[in-house]
Design a protein with these regions (language model features):
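Hard-cation-handling environments
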Residues: 219, 230-258
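Acidic, metal/ion-coordinating pockets
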Residues: 1-234
């Protein structure tokens, strides 16, 4: 009963990605059964045409606070949220809504021509609108998760780093926050809300566990703990072989495991 998601910066952000243009990644996402992703600031590195016509074709991106610049209308190619119907072992299913959010710093962290025609609005306001439209109140979903490319840090008193996003844990109806962007390993609770971030470059997997109980046809979902699992460590010969095979296609030298 696992839902796998990403918090963005999928196709760019490293030297290797600049050479490959992210070509190896669609297959990886399919094998991992990644359901969706937030949009990271690096998603815009190669401009909107690449994001819309290439990256967004093989990955379901969501972002509630990326809108048209002229009138702040929704973008045709981008959904603010996505629902996953997750089957339960004992029968039935729960409906989980993921609301995407992107750091507003993207406006100053990428070239202006790469984000022409779009705007990044306040993430708290955007998330509140999605939840208030009836995701929970109208019984459309059983659970709401914010999937955000907005940094968090355990050393920050508020955990969430960006000033315009600090109130996200206080939005009524939100059950969890999955974050990225600051490259830190985070597992915390703010306002009794779990917040997790799994480091950078696939070094960790973030895992949030929830218990689902059914009573009179309604589901009660309770957070029962999480973990940040380190997956980068001692070399794995099978994985190293696959990586080297892929890198050989682009003229890279053999990967050495330290």
């Amino acid at each position: 009963n696992t839902v796998v998601v990403s918090v963005g910066d999928n196709f760019s952000g490293s030297y290797f990605s600049r050479i490959t243009r992210g070509n190896p990644l669609p297959e990886m996402f399919r094998e991992m059964d990644v359901k969706m992703s937030a949009i990271g600031n690096h998603e815009f590195d190669w401009g909107l045409p690449y994001l819309v016509d290439t990256a967004a074709v093989c990955m379901d991106y969501i972002a509630a606070n990326i809108v048209a610049k002229d009138d702040h209308a929704p973008l045709e190619w981008l959904e603010p949220c996505k629902m996953v119907v997750q089957p339960l072992k004992n029968g039935g299913s729960v409906k989980i809504a993921f609301v995407g959010l992107t750091t507003t710093d993207t406006a100053v962290k990428t070239r202006s021509e790469n984000i022409r025609g779009i705007d990044f609005v306040n993430p708290v306001d955007a998330a509140r609108v999605q939840v208030a439209t009836g995701l929970k109140k109208e019984g459309k979903v059983d659970m709401v998760v914010l999937l955000m490319h907005i940094g968090t840090d355990m050393s920050n008193p508020d955990v969430i780093e960006e000033e315009n996003a600090k109130r996200l844990p206080w939005i009524e109806g939100v059950d969890a926050i999955i974050s990225g962007h600051s490259h830190k390993v985070v597992l915390a609770e703010v306002n009794h809300l779990p917040i997790i971030q799994a480091g950078v470059n696939g070094t960790h997997l973030g895992k949030l566990n929830f218990e689902v109980k059914q009573d009179a046809g309604k589901y009660t979902i309770q957070y029962i703990g999480g973990d940040t699992i380190r997956v980068a460590g001692k070399g794995n010969s099978v994985i190293d072989s696959l990586v080297n095979e892929e890198m050989d296609k682009y003229g890279f030298e053999e990967v050495l495991t330290m």
